[in-house]
A protein has these predicted regions:
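Carbohydrate-interacting/catalytic domains
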Residues: 1-210, 223-238, 254, 547-558, ...
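Catalytic domains of carbohydrate-active enzymes, especially glycoside hydrolases
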Residues: 205, 229-265, 270-272, 280-302, ...
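Hydrophobic faces of well-ordered beta-strands that scaffold small-molecule active sites
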Residues: 208-212, 256-258, 341-345, 399-401, ...
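The substrate-binding groove and active-site-proximal loops of carbohydrate-active enzymes
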Residues: 213-224, 303-322, 366-382, 404-421, ...
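An active-site-proximal structural segment forming one wall of the substrate-binding cleft
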Residues: 234-250, 324-339, 375-399
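Aromatic- and acidic-residue-enriched carbohydrate-binding clefts of CAZyme catalytic domains
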Residues: 268-323, 330, 351-379, 386-387, ...
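Active-site neighborhood of glycoside hydrolase catalytic domains
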Residues: 333, 350-460, 517
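Conserved alpha/beta catalytic core and glycan-binding cleft of carbohydrate-active enzymes
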Residues: 435-630, 643-660
Length: 817
């Protein structure tokens, strides 16, 4: 292969274009035009164009001739999926050219990555010569050289703290298996509905949606594993073969919201995926060995570092190839009934791990989740929007903007933080292009403003961005983290919010099961004192079964899928009645505190039987925890010491040693950190849904699927209750020990009426159309049972039949007016 070198004339041409752009346009407009060209982009002539924004180097006076592109090209075939290997690389360093705050170059001789081969790895380096670059974290620097990673990288097979990979994204698009799906958008042949918006097709909202966490959804914990799962489901559907009970939990939806698949931070004391041997950076080229490994960080996906945001998280790539993300999307698009993919885009914050990866201009200062980003800085603003565009161009049909209320900036005149709604509007304007087709995605905002204002739970309307962007959707008030349906009186005290869903929820995401709510439900402390929260005793006999029954609940499922407006969303782990909690091993500083906050997961998610199961908790058992009760006692004491010592690890270890622990009576802070790591790794494995596949109940999963299909047969249910004069939604009051919701819906054509009654919680209650008609203007004849929860005796199927609904049971009657 050709030795990498700078092509002077081609580089000069690009610098001329760069200078003209900077001179002709205002800062933000110029940055918008430049951002699509940043990173490493293969050209038609076989060269690679490389561009970096480096304001700190320019401000510090680093001479242009001291700035180079450093490349590592493998001399042999590399398997990025290997847990660990030693690879020989040819290293080359090529000087770049400067224009304004940018360093640029057209490079000949870089190896371009594909599905089959690892491309050249690269990063920007500069000679420090004893100079300190103000405002720049230098923790990545080595041997008198500064290192600047590429924040617009397309592939980071060994993590964001390793050099990025030069990757052929255009080939990935050209070879995707769902090109026809995108080519048909906006035409009579489209497989999913779109509507015209500013001259382009905008993907229409889903009927219902499933949220999936890739690293616990399948045995492999990878996007490749999910692609295999949906390809197999598609094969069975085409062949008329029955799905297994577990497979049913994946279908019945026309959209999937994937929890974030962006590169995340790493714990530097534990995660070592790129370890070069000795080499001399002064040399322009040499050969060296590097120990590399497939990243295996554990995380929900929200601890992102912004850098390489456009690339897939290598920890969810089985092969280390970005193609896996496209393969998964294509598998869903090519199903007999296509499933749309919604990306969970978390650009509202950056983990502290981003500090050495990004220019200081990216940060406004510390925030609730690490670093608050500076959305007002023109180039940062443009780069963030470009990162969104590139990521969505993998083929997403929709975008969920995580924590939209966190996109804020400081207004000096008002002396307060202000919501940057103009930036959120820019996010909505981004146009995607896949397979040569331009389109706009379905837009969803998670926005709970004025959170974290003290009275946010009362004052949040969850409609601000819908009012600004009438085509957009938001998460509903019953979908946010603070909803805990396993607690007694939840459905009584949340009635006012559920009623809002009925009245104005047509553009809300609804449902009470998602990654946030199940976690919050597992953290609730219940007790025997008169003022302590109380779990609903009617759901199940123990707390783990109670939690499962609360989030995979026939009554609430029928409520959201068969009666109320909006787009109901379920959570795969809840569908499977599998474990879930806050899992991450990427934070050495706060890991023990995070584990302490999960103390009551032992009560809510573990049983004596599951703890002693040889499949689970091997690391905790190796530390001395032989019983669930021993673990429960220790972790609750750990939580108490966090509060008592203000999270001083050494003092915590001393206090716990005095009390005695299964780990011994002479603990150090290192022992507590080891416990935290063991907890996270064991909980991650425990939550993998492959362990719970055989436990899926045939009748229950068949019913759950029937509920979702009921919604899909009646997409008109998405409109608000009350658009037809006959429609209503209410609850029986006084409750008399039972929270009974009921409602009537009528199709737009007037050819079908549905009557729903649901015992949301409480004592058994008798219902029938005639009984409900005693208090409401409901027709009392012509009703037949359309769907009933398991256990409801509805065989008679006539309007005269009275049925008894236990807690969490519901029934739907149907009639033709």
């Amino acid at each position: 292969m050709t030795t990498p070198q700078l092509r002077p004339q081609q580089t000069a041409d690009r610098l001329d274009w760069l200078a003209e752009t900077l001179d002709e346009f205002a800062p933000f407009e110029a940055a918008q035009r430049i951002a699509p060209h940043l990173g490493a982009q293969p050209r038609d002539d076989g060269c690679v164009e490389v561009g970096f924004w480096t304001p700190a180097l320019v401000e510090a006076g680093i001479p242009a001739e001291d700035v180079s592109l450093e490349m590592f090209t493998p001399t042999e075939s590399v398997d990025p999926s290997a847990p660990e290997s030693t690879v020989e690389f040819d290293r080359h360093r090529v000087p770049l050219r400067r224009e304004g705050e940018y360093h640029w170059g057209v490079i000949e001789g870089m190896q371009i990555g594909t599905r089959e081969q690892l491309g050249s790895l690269y990063q920007l380096v500069y000679q420090k010569r004893g100079r300190k670059v103000p405002g720049r974290d230098d923790s990545l620097d080595r041997d008198g050289w500064g290192i600047v990673p590429d924040p617009l990288a397309d592939s980071v097979p060994f993590g964001v703290f390793a050099p990025a990979e030069c990757y052929d994204i255009e080939r990935l698009d050209a070879d995707r298996a769902d090109r026809e799906y995108f080519e048909a958008l906006g035409s009579d042949d489209e497989r999913v509905s779109t509507s015209e918006h500013d001259g382009l097709p905008r993907v229409e909202p889903a009927v219902s949606m499933l949220e999936i966490h890739p690293s616990t959804a399948t045995e492999s914990g990878s996007l490749a594993g999910l692609a295999r799962r949906y390809r197999e489901i598609g094969r069975k559907q085409r062949d008329g073969e029955e799905l297994t009970p577990a497979e049913r939990n994946f279908v019945g939806y026309d959209a999937i919201q994937v929890m974030p698949v962006e590169p995340i931070t790493q714990q530097h004391g534990t995660h070592h995926f790129w370890e070069p041997g000795e080499f001399d950076r002064e040399e322009a080229s040499e050969t060296l060995e590097v120990r590399v490994g497939r990243p295996d960080m554990i995380n929900w996906g929200y601890d992102i570092v912004i850098s390489a945001f456009a690339a897939p998280n290598p920890a969810v790539l089985e092969t280390g190839r970005p193609d896996e993300l496209v393969d998964f999307i294509a598998a869903c698009h090519n199903l007999p009934e296509p499933i749309k993919i919604v990306f969970d885009i978390a650009l509202g914050h950056a983990d502290d791990g981003a500090i050495p990866l990004l220019a200081d201009e990216f940060f406004e200062g510390p925030g609730m989740y690490g670093q608050h980003l500076d959305y007002q800085q023109p180039t940062v603003r443009a780069i963030l929007l470009e990162l969104q565009r590139r990521k969505m161009d993998y083929g997403a049909d929709g975008i969920r903007v995580d924590g939209a209320q966190d996109f804020r900036y400081y207004d000096a005149e008002r002396d307060e933080m202000v919501h940057d709604d103009a930036f959120l509007a820019k996010m909505d304007e981004v146009v995607q292009e896949v397979a040569g087709t331009e389109y706009r995605p379905w837009m969803i905002y998670e926005d709970g403003r004025p959170w974290p204002q003290e009275d946010w739970e009362l004052t949040s309307t969850y409609r601000t961005l819908i009012e600004q962007h009438p085509h957009s959707f938001q998460w509903s008030p019953v979908t946010f983290a603070h909803n805990t349906p396993a607690l007694l009186t939840f459905w009584a005290t949340k009635w006012w919010r559920v009623r809002e869903v009925a009245d104005m929820g047509s553009q809300w995401l609804t449902g009470v099961a998602n990654h946030d709510t199940v976690r919050r439900g597992s953290q609730v402390v219940v007790g025997d004192s008169w003022d302590a929260p109380q779990e609903n005793p009617n759901l199940a006999d123990d707390m783990p079964a109670t939690l499962d029954a609360a989030y995979n609940n026939p009554a609430s499922s029928m409520l959201f899928h068969c009666l109320l407006p909006g787009v109901p969303m379920d959570f795969l782990n809840a569908n499977m009645r599998g474990p879930w909690g806050f899992i991450r091993d990427t934070d050495d500083t706060w890991n023990v505190k995070v584990v302490a906050e999960e103390a009551y997961v032992v009560d809510w998610q573990l049983t004596d039987e599951t703890f002693v199961d040889d499949r689970f908790f091997p690391r905790l058992k190796s530390l001395g925890f032989e019983t669930r009760e021993g673990l429960r006692e220790f972790i609750q004491r750990l939580a108490d010491t966090v509060e008592a010592t203000d999270y001083h690890l050494e003092t915590m270890a001393t206090v716990l040693s005095t009390l005695g622990t299964p780990m011994g009576d002479d603990l150090s802070y290192k022992d507590l950190k080891a416990f935290g790591q063991a907890w996270m790794a064991d909980m991650h494995e425990y939550a993998n849904l492959s362990h719970w596949t055989a436990d899926q109940d045939d009748d229950r999963t068949a019913f759950d699927l029937a509920v979702r299909e009921f919604r899909h047969d009646r997409p008109w249910l998405r409109r608000d209750v009350g658009e037809a004069d006959s429609e209503l939604f209410d609850y029986r009051h006084p409750t008399r020990g039972t929270v009974l919701y009921y409602g009537l819906r009528e199709s737009p054509a007037g050819d079908e009426q549905l009557l729903v009654a649901a015992n949301m919680e409480g004592q058994p209650v008798e219902v029938s159309p005639a009984i409900l008609a005693e208090d409401e203007q409901i027709p009392d004849d012509g009703w037949e049972v359309a769907l009933a929860a398991p256990g409801v005796d509805s065989e008679a199927g006539t309007d005269a039949a009275v049925v008894e609904l236990q807690d969490s049971q519901a029934i739907i009657w149907q009639r033709e007016p």
